[in-house]
């Protein structure tokens, strides 16, 4: 009898968990079925290959944004951070090639990767220091620094588009292993490392604690400012790596290479279960969210829907994702008994938990 009574609440709890954490997978399955019905070419092996390869740099970038969001922040400057990394990296390679007979050795390509990650790290750290030490809102700070990076990009490039990357740089995309480009495996490695850091390390627990309640984390001995600074710095570094991967894919770069990626990653993160309030997140769900965004773009193109309509659809998805996140994280009423006097048997009252 007791087991039958407890079955109902357990079933309700399981349904609630599936609703909160499994929505992204239901949406993913629905989109695959819908676009396959609209155009059977959607589920072809060639198109699936394109979806996987075109998602790799977004997955890498998504792992970056997971740190800052789970830590309770947001970074809207990462798009132009990517542009800064890609344009300066191209100009460095071009300068080296022009002074060395047009050749760029592999060791210099490795230097470029170190440079891109380092530059992203420093730009992210700048955001983190301003937010943590001046106690400013990350949203406002990163909008401002985004404009700074944007101005620097256009100044450095003179609004030009650069193309023709060295073959050994593009090897990250052109070299295949088991039929897939190397950067797909790089994206998988980033997912594994991010999951491990956030779930199995002391730093990851600190990030979750600061994102969940910064003041409680500080009172428990966690250096909340440094955790916030490091989450921004790690986000910048990972976006720097994503910028280099994107450049290898596109075989070109400009001041517009990167902006817009922050929108895709932010939406995918929220869809995938990373709360805008911080303190919780699921990197596997984030990957599913990336595929949701890519499937929408790819499916709409195959369906012959206008490119401009995609912006409207993606905007609606972001608004819906934010609303759903707010709904999931709103305070839930609980019943507490207040006794006004000993033995008076106070009336139960509802309060927000």
Tell where the protein language model's regions lie, with residue ranges.
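Cytosolic-side transmembrane-helix boundaries in multi-pass membrane proteins
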Residues: 1-31, 37, 219, 223-226, ...
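Short cytoplasmic-facing helical segments at TM-TM junctions of multi-pass membrane proteins
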Residues: 203-228
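Transmembrane alpha-helical segments in multi-pass inner-membrane proteins
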Residues: 239, 250-315
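Hydrophobic core segments of alpha-helical transmembrane domains in multi-pass membrane transport
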Residues: 24-37, 65, 117-120, 146-150, ...
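Transmembrane helix-bundle core of multi-pass membrane transporters
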Residues: 134, 138-200, 227-230, 248-258, ...
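Inter-helical junctions in multi-pass inner-membrane proteins, predominant
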Residues: 40-53, 153-156, 180, 198, ...
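Alpha-helical transmembrane segments within multi-pass membrane transporters and channels
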Residues: 98-145, 288
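Single transmembrane alpha-helix segments in multi-pass membrane proteins
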Residues: 33-38, 42-96, 129-136, 270-280, ...
């Amino acid at each position: 009898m007791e087991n039958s009574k407890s079955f109902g609440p357990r079933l309700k709890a399981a349904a609630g968990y599936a609703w909160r954490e499994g929505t992204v997978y239901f949406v993913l399955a629905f989109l695959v079925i819908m676009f396959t019905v609209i155009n059977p070419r959607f589920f072809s092996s060639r198109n699936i290959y394109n979806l996987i390869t075109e998602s790799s740099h977004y997955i890498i970038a998504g792992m970056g944004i997971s740190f800052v969001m789970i830590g309770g922040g947001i970074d809207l400057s990462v798009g132009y951070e990517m542009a800064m990394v890609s344009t300066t990296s191209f100009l460095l390679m071009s300068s080296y090639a022009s002074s060395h007979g047009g050749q760029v050795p592999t060791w210099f390509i490795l230097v470029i990767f170190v440079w891109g990650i380092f530059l992203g790290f420093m730009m992210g750290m700048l955001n983190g220091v301003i937010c943590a030490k001046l106690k400013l809102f990350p949203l406002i700070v990163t909008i401002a620094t985004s404009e700074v990076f944007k101005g620097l990009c256009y100044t450095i490039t003179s609004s030009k588009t650069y193309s023709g990357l060295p073959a050994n740089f593009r090897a990250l995309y052109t070299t295949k292993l088991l039929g897939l480009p190397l950067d797909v495996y790089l994206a998988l490695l980033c997912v594994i490392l991010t999951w491990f850091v956030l779930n199995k390390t002391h730093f990851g627990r600190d990030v979750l604690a600061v994102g969940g309640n910064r003041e409680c984390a500080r009172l428990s001995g966690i250096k909340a400012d440094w955790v916030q600074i490091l989450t921004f710095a790690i986000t910048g570094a990972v976006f720097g790596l994503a910028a280099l991967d994107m450049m290898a894919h596109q075989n070109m770069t400009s001041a517009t290479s990167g902006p817009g990626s922050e929108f895709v990653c932010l939406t995918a993160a929220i869809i995938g279960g990373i709360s805008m309030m911080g303190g919780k997140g699921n990197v596997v769900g984030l990957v599913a969210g990336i595929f949701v965004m890519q499937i929408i773009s790819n499916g709409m193109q195959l369906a012959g829907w206008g490119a401009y309509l995609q912006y409207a659809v993606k905007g609606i998805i972001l608004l819906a994702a934010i609303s759903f996140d707010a709904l999931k994280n709103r305070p839930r009423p609980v019943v507490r008994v207040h006794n006004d006097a000993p033995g008076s048997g106070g009336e139960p009252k509802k309060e927000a938990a």
